């Protein structure tokens, strides 16, 4: 149990650091939508597709690897709460079109990139 907790803890810390890096890189970039959150969710969507395909094809790996990568790292990288707060802020400012566009971009983009990640793994396997 302690190894599982450690795997999640380490993965989440690394994922959160990468998300912070994406946010810092997007500071000063002229954009109506928060790019750091979008990049985090798109990269996370792609990587989880690869991870799902990888772990599905490698069931012999210890469960701690899946906890490290999917639950920890990708859980720390992707951010539904920040996305939700940003969209609600747009709605509160009356930016309904931007709010809808941002929500659709995150949802559709993440789903498409998850599929692309699965297909990428299958192509290189």
Swiss-Prot record:
The chain crosses the membrane at residues 2-22, 35-55, 68-88, 98-118. InterPro entries: FluC (IPR003691). Coiled coil: none annotated. Pfam families: CRCB. It catalyses: fluoride(in) = fluoride(out). It is found in: Cell inner membrane. Keywords: Cell inner membrane, Cell membrane, Ion channel, Ion transport, Membrane, Metal-binding, Sodium, Transmembrane, Transmembrane helix, Transport. Belongs to the fluoride channel Fluc/FEX (TC 1.A.43) family. It is a multi-pass membrane protein. The keyword Transmembrane helix applies. Its main location: membrane. Na(+) binds at residues 75, 78. This is Fluoride-specific ion channel FluC. One of its GO terms (cellular component) is plasma membrane. One of its GO terms (biological process) is cellular detoxification of fluoride. GO terms for molecular function: fluoride channel activity; metal ion binding. Na(+) is not transported, but it plays an essential structural role and its presence is essential for fluoride channel function. Fluoride-specific ion channel. Important for reducing fluoride concentration in the cell, thus reducing its toxicity. It comes from the Bacteria. It comes from Polynucleobacter asymbioticus (strain DSM 18221 / CIP 109841 / QLW-P1DMWA-1). The lineage of its organism: Bacteria, Pseudomonadati, Pseudomonadota, Betaproteobacteria, Burkholderiales.
């Amino acid at each position: 149990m302690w190894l599982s907790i450690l795997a999640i803890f380490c993965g989440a810390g690394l994922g959160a650091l990468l998300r912070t890096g994406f946010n810092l890189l997007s500071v000063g970039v002229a954009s109506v939508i928060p790019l750091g959150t979008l990049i985090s969710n798109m990269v996370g969507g792609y990587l989880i597709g690869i991870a799902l395909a990888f772990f599905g094809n490698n069931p012999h790996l210890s469960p701690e690897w899946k906890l490290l990568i999917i639950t920890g790292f990708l859980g720390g990288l992707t951010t539904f709460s920040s996305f939700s707060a940003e969209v609600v802020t747009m709605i509160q400012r009356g930016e309904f079109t931007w709010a809808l566009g941002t929500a659709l971009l995150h949802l559709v983009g993440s789903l498409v990139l998850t599929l692309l990640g699965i297909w990428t793994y299958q192509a290189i396997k």
